[in-house]
Amino acid sequence: MTILQAIVLAIVEGLTEFLPVSSTGHMIIAEGIMGVESTSFVRAFTVMIQFGAILSVLVLYRKRFFCFPVAPRALGQGKGKEFMSRFDLYWKLLIALVPAVILGFLFEDWVDRMLGSVWVVAVVLFLGGIFMLFVDKLFASSDRGEITYPKAFVIGLFQCLAIFLPGLSRSMATIVGGQQQKLSRKAAAEFSFFLAVPTMLGATLLKAYKLYKEGGIEIFREHMIVLLVGNIVAFIVALAAIKFFIGFLTRYGFKAFGYYRILVGGLLIVLMLSGVSLAV
């Protein structure tokens, strides 16, 4: 993989990871256009550059995400409540993460086989687009209430759909899950971003460990520049993508993303029917 190819893939990752459009489907198209061979390192690279995207969430939402100890005298100034609120978020994220961890571990081999099917990715991307055309009407009402522990768990169950249906988009599944629990679009999207941090961090570390077992520390030394550049680019692009998405979603809803998914999914299907070789 060249530096230029790494930059392009990182741009695709940063643009699509937090949007409900399936980063996997876009990676397939980008790799196919550039003629990137689907080696074990390339597959690991597409997962490991998620670390840069994770950092973008932590930077943008650092005041809401990070939890610091509160000095005793600060409790009287109301900061203790703020501390507990942030700590409460961690518990909700942990509860939401549990279903994916359990099911991902139990069905790891099956999930890997499904992820290796471009047809599955394309069809799910296409059908998910059709569904998104109706999301705004299906979940038009929201109580704009806070995310409770039961709601967090249900959103975690929705996240599992993205594990078993590659091409669905983790972002789409969790945001729709949040709206199904009557959260506002913005609240559902932001919790989806927060949940992405432990989910994607776990996937990144697991992939890095598997790559280490396969090629040892030398494989990281050999591709260190590519990995570094990829993560930096993914971080910068994801920052812009998240800011855009929150504003766009609040004003216009999901319909535009539905049409876009149909277009991309249809393109993948046409390419495969035309005999173009694509690999995950």
Swiss-Prot record:
Protein role: Catalyzes the dephosphorylation of undecaprenyl diphosphate (UPP). Confers resistance to bacitracin.
Organism of this sequence: Porphyromonas gingivalis (strain ATCC 33277 / DSM 20709 / CIP 103683 / JCM 12257 / NCTC 11834 / 2561)
Q: Which InterPro entries match?
A: UppP (IPR003824)
Q: Which reaction does it catalyse?
A: di-trans,octa-cis-undecaprenyl diphosphate + H2O = di-trans,octa-cis-undecaprenyl phosphate + phosphate + H(+)
| Top EC group | hydrolase
Family that this chain belongs to: Belongs to the UppP family.
Query: By what name is this protein known?
Result: Undecaprenyl-diphosphatase
What membrane topology term does the record carry?
Answer: Multi-pass membrane protein
Per the record, the gene is: uppP
Reading the lineage from the top rank, the first entry is: Bacteria
